[in-house]
UniProtKB/Swiss-Prot annotation:
PANTHER family: HOMEOBOX PROTEIN EMX-RELATED, HOMEOBOX PROTEIN NOTOCHORD
SUPFAM superfamilies: Homeodomain-like
Known role: Transcription factor that controls node morphogenesis. Acts downstream of both FOXA2 and Brachyury (T) during notochord development. Is essential for cilia formation in the posterior notochord (PNC) and for left-right patterning; acts upstream of FOXJ1 and RFX3 in this process and is required for the expression of various components important for axonemal assembly and function. Plays a role in regulating axial versus paraxial cell fate. Activates the transcription of ciliary proteins C11orf97 homolog, FAM183B and SPACA9 in the embryonic ventral node.
Disease listed for this protein: Defects in Noto are the cause of the truncate (tc) phenotype. Truncate (tc) is a recessive mutation that affects the development of the caudal notochord. Mice homozygous for tc are viable but viability is reduced, which is attributed at least in part to spinal injury in the sacral and lower lumbar region.
Molecular function via GO: sequence-specific double-stranded DNA binding
Protein keywords: Developmental protein, Disease variant, DNA-binding, Homeobox, Nucleus, Transcription, Transcription regulation
InterPro entries: EMX-VAX-Noto_Homeobox_TFs, HD, Homeodomain-like_sf
One GO cellular component term: nucleoplasm
GO biological-process terms attached to the record: determination of left/right symmetry; dorsal/ventral pattern formation; embryonic pattern specification; heart looping; motile cilium assembly; notochord development; regulation of cilium assembly
Biased composition annotated in UniProt, kind: Polar residues: 1-13
Protein name in the entry: Homeobox protein notochord
Record bears the keyword DNA-binding: yes
Region ranges (Disordered): 1-21, 208-240
Name of the coding gene: Noto
Organism of this sequence: Mus musculus (Mouse)
Amino acid sequence: MSSPAPSGTQVQPGSLRPCPGAVSPVVPRRLARGRLESSFSVEAILARPKTRELAATSLPLSTCTSLNLLGAVSQYGVLPWVCSTGSWLPAYLSVGVYPLCSMSCVPGLNVTHHQQGLRLTGSELPYCLGPLKWAPTVDLRDHGTERHTKRVRTTFNLQQLQELEKVFAKQHNLVGKERAQLAARLHLTENQVRIWFQNRRVKYQKQQKLKLPSSSVMEEPSSSSDGNIQSEDAELGIGS
């Protein structure tokens, strides 16, 4: 261990080395004329230690784990996990950027967590050597009520309606091959034809209830195939 230099001894420029792990402030040298050298002169700027060389080493995985850098999750999700070489930062912020962990970045971590855990100043924005990953957006909508998909109502043209009404006047229910042939002739699907006949039967029954007296309200409409209406409605259900 070297003894401290006696008072009056002049310190030669370049004899002091920066402490490892920290950047010592540049001490302005005293010129021969008795005035202090400016810290913004060319000599003072060149004499400063290179920040990038000191920032080449990163903390090991055990240190990152002990500081809870890998498991911390951003509460507010305001800023993404900063993952770049600091080139995107302004000049006055990119000077004091130091790497904290050499592992891949974890989305959801922001600068506030690192400043609280490592007691860093505002200009020392920590970053990680890894690809840029933005924090996932948080959907603030209420997920308690799920929206049901609205059924699209089929629009029939005049020719299709006339043909459907003509067939319904003869037969109130179509099944199997007859329904498939009618759907192909009208350029519709079998499901569209089935739903139209179900709705038309409901409308027909309401009309019959208004016409008939109260004693015959529960009577079914007379048709050759009306006996199969209830069985089909029970299996498929009445749609709208």
